């Protein structure tokens, strides 16, 4: 009886999130130095894959001391990627998917102290030279989008594919 239970599909481990849409944002994985268009250091970012490839976790440290993190995941039910960002000053909740080779996510930014919320969108574009451009916009006036952040990611160290719990990952 115990042998039958151990082999049943209900007791099998999770299949993980591999292939296709689950890997559409993999170009963002890695350790990065982030600079603005004029070359000013904006900060450092690390994006890792966790939980059998089902989650991308971002850890941001700005050059001025600010920090934040995001959880990024693909939902196959609505065929959309979602990012939930949390920092001491703001929360961002955006969703979408690949559009012409770029990851485009749209939703809202909430400024915590002011308790204000505005439409927000982010576009991540892999560039031919191996960098990634991250361009954020916000709309405080109906239909008028203004740049919020424009950063260029350059790899700073080896690319971490995953941590423990990811498909094929070795324990830490």
Task: Indicate residue ranges for each PLM-predicted region.
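Bacterial N-terminal signal peptides
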Residues: 1-6
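Intrinsic disorder/low-complexity segments in short proteins, especially the signal peptide
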Residues: 8-10
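Hydrophobic small-molecule pocket/channel-lining residues, especially in calycin-type beta-barrels
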Residues: 12-172
């Amino acid at each position: 009886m115990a042998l039958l239970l151990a082999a049943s599909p209900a007791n099998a481990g999770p299949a993980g999130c591999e292939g296709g849409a689950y890997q559409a944002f993999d170009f963002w994985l890695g350790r990065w130095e982030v600079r603005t268009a004029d070359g000013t250091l904006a900060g450092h970012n690390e994006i890792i894959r966790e939980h059998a490839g089902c989650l991308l976790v971002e850890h941001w440290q700005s050059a001025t001391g600010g920090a934040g993190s995001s959880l990024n995941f693909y939902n196959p039910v609505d065929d959309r990627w979602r990012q939930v960002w949390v920092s001491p000053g703001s929360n961002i909740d955006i969703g979408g998917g690949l559009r012409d080779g770029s990851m485009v996510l749209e939703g809202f930014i909430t400024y915590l102290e002011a308790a204000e919320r505005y439409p927000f969108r982010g576009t991540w574009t892999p560039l031919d030279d191996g960098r990634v451009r991250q361009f954020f916009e916000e709309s405080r006036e109906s239909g008028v989008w203004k740049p919020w952040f424009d950063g260029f990611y350059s790899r700073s160290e080896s690319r971490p594919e995953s941590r423990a719990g990811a498909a094929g990952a070795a324990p830490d």
